[in-house]
């Protein structure tokens, strides 16, 4: 790869205000590709919403409705990376905000070093997640599956 830079990815550099604004605008667009699921303050999820979760190809789709509710409600508010239980190949990003009663789920796919989120190409997982974290004002929390 040599000294070539891929697009504008510069690790360990401080972004300008203009770049941050551009990233913020991109993130607003990116958030639209997430599958939003509404949850009640009690942690209960409507049957229609549970059906939608199962149709996402979500890795918990084989679990019972109660297990899905318990798993999602037990997480604190924040942004998570979750791996597929069975294969550890699929990675999902989950953003939970109980105050607003919402849950965003998007599937991440890696092809070589490129990152695809719900089929859309991103040049850097690190940049995407940092932007996501800044936008939602939540720290990233990585799950421990093993």
Curated annotation (Swiss-Prot):
InterPro entries: SH2_dom_sf. Keywords: Early protein. Induction: Expressed in the early phase of the viral replicative cycle. The keyword Iron does not apply. It comes from the Viruses. The keyword tRNA processing does not apply. Belongs to the asfivirus MGF 100 family. Plays a role in virus cell tropism, and may be required for efficient virus replication in macrophages. This is Protein MGF 100-3L. It comes from African swine fever virus (strain Badajoz 1971 Vero-adapted).
């Amino acid at each position: 790869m040599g000294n070539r830079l891929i697009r504008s990815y510069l690790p360990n550099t401080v972004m300008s205000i203009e770049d941050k604004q551009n990233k913020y605008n991109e993130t607003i667009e990116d958030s639209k590709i997430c599958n939003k699921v509404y949850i009640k303050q009690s942690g209960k999820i409507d049957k229609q919403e549970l059906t939608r979760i199962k149709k996402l190809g979500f890795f918990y789709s084989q679990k019972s409705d109660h297990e899905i509710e318990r798993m999602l409600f037990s997480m604190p508010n924040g942004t998570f990376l979750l791996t597929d239980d069975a294969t550890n190949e699929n990675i999902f990003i989950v953003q939970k905000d109980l105050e607003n009663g919402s849950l965003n789920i998007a599937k991440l796919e890696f092809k070589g070093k490129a990152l695809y989120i719900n089929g859309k190409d991103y040049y850097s997982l690190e940049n995407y997640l940092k932007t996501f974290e800044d936008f939602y004002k939540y720290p990233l929390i990585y799950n421990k599956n093993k």
